[in-house]
Amino acid sequence: MIDFDGYRPNVGIVICNRKGQVLWAKRCGQNSWQFPQGGINDNESAEQAMYRELHEEVGLQPKDVRLLYVSKHWLRYKLPKRLLRYDSKPMCIGQKQRWFLLQLVSDEKNINMQTTKSPEFDGWRWVSFWYPVRQVVSFKRDVYRKVMKEFASILFTDNPLIFSASREASLQHYSANKKYSQTKYTKRHFYKSRGQ
C-alpha cells in the first residue's frame, strides 16, 4: 500500500529495558543495524501492524511488552535513488512511519529473531538510548533523531520511576553531544521534573 505521495505506511518499534537501553537489531547477512520496522497491510491499523511485526521480527507477544507511547506524527524518509524500483507502479519513494515505544516486561530470552522462514534480522544487542541516532544508515538518521528526542521526553521526564538509574546519564549524554544538542532535556530540566 503506497499513498498518493509515494510513501509506504510503516511502523517502527523501539523496545527498551529497565536500564534505559534499546534493542538494536542486525539485518540478515549484513553489517547493518536498525530498529525493527515493517509495512502496514490493507485493513490493518498501525497498532495491529506493530504487534504483528513485533512477533515476526523479534519473536515477542503483546504480553511480553508494555506500550509506553506512540509518536504524535507520521515521520517520513526518502529512499536513496539506488534503492528505488523505477519499474514498479506505483513507485515507492520512501516510508512514512508511526513509531511505538515499548518496554520489555518479560525475560529477554523470549527474544527470537528466527520466527519466520525469511527473518529480517540475525542478531541483536542492547545499546545506549542515543546510540542508534549516530549509527543508523544516513537516510534514516533524521527520523531516528526526531523519534528518540520525542521518546526521551517520555522516558526521562514524565515517567520518573521507569529508569531511575539511567535518567541523568542519558540526559547528560544528549546535552553534551553538540551534534544533537537541539533539546531542552538538560540536567536542570531533569531536577526540575523531580521537584528539586
UniProtKB/Swiss-Prot annotation:
Summary of the function given for this chain in its UniProt record: Accelerates the degradation of transcripts by removing pyrophosphate from the 5'-end of triphosphorylated RNA, leading to a more labile monophosphorylated state that can stimulate subsequent ribonuclease cleavage.
Family membership noted in the UniProt record: Belongs to the Nudix hydrolase family. RppH subfamily.
HAMAP family recorded: Nudix_RppH (MF_00298)
InterPro entries, sorted: Nudix_hydrolase (IPR020476), NUDIX_hydrolase-like_dom_sf (IPR015797), NUDIX_hydrolase_CS (IPR020084), NUDIX_hydrolase_dom (IPR000086), RppH (IPR022927)
Domain of life: Bacteria
Provenance organism: Haemophilus influenzae (strain PittEE)
NCBIfam families with a match to the protein in the record: PRK00714.1-1, PRK00714.1-4, PRK00714.1-5
Residue window of motif Nudix box: 38-59
Listed name of the protein: RNA pyrophosphohydrolase
A Pfam family annotated for this UniProt entry: NUDIX
Cellular component, GO, one term: cytoplasm
EC number: 3.6.1.-
Taxonomic lineage: Bacteria, Pseudomonadati, Pseudomonadota, Gammaproteobacteria, Pasteurellales
Cofactor: a divalent metal cation
Coiled coil location: none
